[in-house]
A protein has these predicted regions:
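Amphipathic alpha-helical segments of tetratricopeptide repeats
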Residues: 58-65, 99-106, 140-147, 180-191, ...
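Hydrophobic positions within repeat-based interaction scaffolds
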Residues: 28-38, 51, 92, 176, ...
Length: 324
């Protein structure tokens, strides 16, 4: 690394140290990461859909290298992959950067990022571009590898992605069975499962749709309790809106929908989840018989699908991985 680049990184570290808010410092402590790295990562997340994040992710990678933090280096590589994943129109780049993340994760013994890139980016990319059979083929290949290596982290990602695939294929019962397997594996071996809140939220949606309110409430409570990020919290809240809408408690649904709307306005990191918000908003308006507003929300949802190049997917689905 050149002397000039080291000086530039030093300046970035200094500036971040000055402006890091107390909340970010606290979150950095929770995740056991240097606060300046975490603050810069949050800035990357705010620009995840913009080309500038490509250079920012490179900077994050070198900042992490200066700190000898291989985990944040993997995060930086994953952030670059995230950009191409969300663009949705450059398969070669998704495949290439998936391979880069997997290679680095393999070399540094970080299976979490190895399977994240494979499942939550490459396979989900195939799903969101309407190729569920290719996604299933990749998932089965990944499952075989995780089973052969007896890699519990890999199995978690496999079970989760299987649930996504069968949800897309409208095999809801099979999808819920895979989610249950993911939860059981997590609890049995006390595994770190950063996104398990999303799994509980999805399971709650299944119970809501299949008129099992008691099970839905239990899953929703667990989704809230296990939320680790702003995206987890918003998805849990949206699942609650669906539950209230289905059960006819429209005042509660409207109140929580308003809270969600405010969170989206306040936090740019949630931008890629707006499609999910509009889907829930449309469902609420349909159930409360506000059909003109329901149509408007559906049109906004479709516009988001076009923006994220996810129009090939079922409108109920996504934003629920990776994340990273």
């Amino acid at each position: 690394m050149s002397q000039l680049y080291r000086i530039i990184l030093g300046c970035i570290f200094s500036l971040l140290f000055i402006v890091i808010p107390a909340k970010a410092q606290k979150e950095a402590e929770v995740y056991n990461v240097d606060s300046s790295l975490y603050a810069y990562y949050q800035r990357c997340q705010e620009n995840l859909l913009e080309p500038v994040v490509l250079s920012m992710s490179d900077t994050l990678f070198h900042m992490a290298a200066e700190q000898n933090d291989q985990r944040m280096q993997a995060v930086a590589l994953s952030t670059r992959l995230d950009y191409y994943y969300y663009q949705g129109n450059n398969e070669d780049s998704v495949v290439f950067h998936t391979s880069k993340v997997k290679q680095f994760a393999k070399e540094t013994l970080q299976p979490k990022y190895y399977y994240f890139a494979w499942a939550n980016r490459l396979i989900l990319y195939y799903l969101k571009t309407g190729r569920s059979n290719i996604a299933l083929y990749e998932a089965e290949k990944m499952l075989k590898e995780a089973q052969e290596e007896d890699n519990k982290t890999g199995l978690l990602y496999c079970y989760n992605i299987m649930s996504q695939i069968y949800t897309i294929k409208n095999f809801d019962v099979m999808a819920s069975e895979w989610r249950q397997k993911e939860i059981e594996l997590t609890e049995k071996y006390k595994l770190e499962n950063y996104n398990i809140s999303n799994t509980y939220a999805q399971l709650a949606s299944y119970y809501t749709t299949h008129h099992q309110p008691e099970l839905a409430v239990k899953a929703l409570e667990k989704a809230v309790r296990t939320a680790n990020s702003a995206s987890h919290k918003i998805l849990a809240k949206l699942a609650y809106v669906d539950y209230y809408s289905e059960s006819g408690d429209f005042p509660a649904a409207e109140k929580m929908l308003k809270e969600c709307r405010e969170l989206f306005d306040q936090d740019k990191r949630l931008d890629s989840l707006k499609k999910r918000f509009y889907r829930t908003e449309s469902f609420y308006y349909q159930r409360s018989k506000q059909f003109v507003k329901a149509l408007e929300a559906t049109e906004k949802q479709e516009a988001e699908e076009q923006r994220l190049n996810e129009y090939a997917m079922n409108g109920e689905q996504y934003r629920i991985k990776g994340e990273i």
